[in-house]
Amino acid sequence: MSTIGSFDGFQPVSLKQEEEDQPSENDHLSTKEGNSGKDPGSRRISRQQSITKATLYPNPYRQPYVSRKYFVTRPGAIETAVEDLKGHIAQTSGETVQGFWLLTEIDHWNNEKEKILLLTDKTLLICKYDFIMLSCVQVQQVPLNAICCICLGKFVFPGMSLDKRPGDGLRIFWGSTEGWSLLSRWNPWSTEVPYATFTEHPMKQTSEKFLEICKLSEFTSKLVPAIENAHKNSAGSGSGKELVVLTQPILIETYTGLMSFIGNRNKLGYSLARGSIGF
């Protein structure tokens, strides 16, 4: 007599075994590759290599995070500064700005300072601008007809100086150094220095825009004709000055240079992000 619900005659089946017996997609690929007469391993390696792509990073010598540390490179910073300074010049003197540049000033103690230079028909303006607060800190106005000499050349230092800088510079004289007092010469904060020394800004290579406004040769090519025109216009007043352009080494008299060594290594003269503090 048979019993309802009896499982006699049924055999247990392993689902795992059935799954292993079924061909996978990789097996199909291997079969196709085998039919083509090629080694599956080498075919798989060549397929992995084909999905890789090597490209050169733009500006490999200038990492993006380095340029972002300088507030002047932030979007709209230099444009805001120039518009502020143009408005200030228009209100105070009524002159029109012919051009502007972003350079590094090197004072008589070899300290670097970030400066914006603006040129009008009559005046050279050397501006210290705070790119963090977006406000002008100081403006030094130099009449073009007072500039008597321009010196172009490489920087030279006394033998014992700690902070010797390479590269070329530009020095603009608007007075004689013979009457420069010893007290002013040895005062790092003196405002009676009869000249100003400039070199190119470190962010020159970050973009085409900064390449144009940070290039020292571009500034010189505009400054020299402007000074000559100013001298011609003031010739009737009996000044009789002529611009002298020299090509010779530029001496920076820092015999020890410890203060500038520390300041320049830490970029204290620039509006720079320094961790959670920027100054």
Swiss-Prot record:
PANTHER family: TUMOR PROTEIN P63-REGULATED GENE 1 PROTEIN (PTHR31108:SF6), TUMOR PROTEIN P63-REGULATED GENE 1-LIKE PROTEIN (PTHR31108). PROSITE patterns: HSAC2. Highly expressed in skin. Also detected at low levels in tongue and esophagus. Residues 1-49 are annotated as: Disordered. This is Tumor protein p63-regulated gene 1 protein. One of its GO terms (cellular component) is cytoplasm. It comes from Mus musculus (Mouse). Residues 72-259 form the hSac2 domain. Disulfide bonds: none annotated. It is found in: Cytoplasm. Belongs to the TPRG1 family. The keyword NAD does not apply. Keywords: Cytoplasm. The gene is Tprg1.
